[in-house]
C-alpha cells in the first residue's frame, strides 16, 4: 500500500497558490520560484504531488512569456486615463517572434482546490494557457517582492461570485474585509478597446489598478 505523501511547507505554499491565487503554473516557473532554479528537483517533487492526486500534469503548446518586471500602467483615481492606443502597442509588440512551443504545466486537482477552500472552476482552454502563465508570472513577481502580498492576492475564480454583472479582473489585492483595494490585470496582447474598457470599469468603481 502506498504511504501518504508528507507535505512540506514549500508544497503547501505551491498547492495553496494553485487553489486560490492562480490557475496553473509552468514547470520552469515552479522550479525558479520554489526550487531555486533546480529543474530536476522540481520535476521530481511535482511528479510526486501529481502521483498523489494533488496536481495534474499536462504538456501543452504555449508562447514563451516576455519579461514581466513591472506594470505597463499604474493608475490611481484622479489621474489622467492612459493612452489606450499607446499601451496596446507596447503590450502587443512584446510578443513579436514568440512562437508556440511545448510547455509542461501543472493544474490543481479538485482534491487540492477543495482542501484549500477554493472555488469550482471551468477547465482552462488550451488557447488561454499562455495568458494564464502570464498571470502566474505576475503573482510570482508580487510574491518575490512582498510575502504579505500573497495572502492579499485573490484570483479570478475566487472573485467571480462577488462580481456578478461586473467586469472581472485577473486578480485583486484585498483588505482584511475582503474588499478589493487594487485590481490586477495581465494585458496579454490586448487591443486599445479592451484596455479602455478595463480602465473605464476601474475608474467607475474608484479602484486603482496595475496593468501588466
Regions found by a protein language model. Name each.
Residues 1-114:
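Nuclease-adjacent, charged terminal/linker segments that flank catalytic cores
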Residues 25, 41-44, 129-133, 137, ...:
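Short, well-structured alpha-helical interface segments that form or flank functional binding sites
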Residues 34-35, 120-135:
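A short, highly charged nucleic-acid-interacting micro-segment common to nuclease
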Residues 58, 73, 78-96, 125-131, ...:
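Active-site metal-binding core of divalent-cation-utilizing nuclease and nuclease-like domains
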Residues 117-119, 183:
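Short, charged, solvent-exposed linker or helix-capping segments at domain edges/interfaces
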Residues 141, 179-182, 186-212:
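Catalytic cores of nucleic-acid endonucleases
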